[in-house]
Amino acid sequence: MRRHFQFNSCGNLMTFYQDPELWFASGDCLIHFYERGQSRRGASIRVSLADIEFSNCGPFLDRFLIYDAPETPLSSSDLDKYAESPGFFNAPAPPAKYEMYVPAPEHLSREEAFRYHLTTRNFFAWMFEKPLVGECLGDALIALLNRMDEFRPNQEVNQDDMLAYLDEQGYTDFRDCPDHALAVLQFAEKLRDRETWTDAFVHCAGMWDLLDKSAEFEVSH
């Protein structure tokens, strides 16, 4: 199924409350977009720690993971019983075992901090095969790759994983979609990927009369 980039102005996600696409009730790890003890607004993302570990994000885990979440962990049998209960979909989520606090660097402005958090959110979107959010897809892709290089050890693997993610999300489906073509053209220039750049460029040329109507045009022009 084709997945679409979600456009959001800065004001739409400024609070970073629970992200419905990245909040899994059975997840055992809570992700907070602030320093520990500096806010009471709660976690923004709830996912499985095993999935994070499977994504080869060792530096990210070493830097941010906290093991002393206050709740008592549930056993697998407890989780099975919980899932089978009649009120499962309306019941409170089971307690989490782990927490991660991922604050923006202190020197960033308010707008820069927002963009930092947005990229952190998109890092998890890549991890769990969800669409990206942001104002411009090209910028979001480049920011995500930079964050992957920070949080994962192998840049070559990161590039391959990003290209696979673009295909999975439908961002390389350029048919009648100048947004995708321009965004991937910009991203391929950053990546220095000749094949991807050429494919995006050819589609841009074929849609030349639509390019200036795209939100990506000023960024990539």
Where are these regions (language model features)?
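Post-BTB helical module
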Residues: 102-221
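BTB/POZ (also called T1 in voltage-gated K+ channels) oligomerization domain detector
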Residues: 1-151
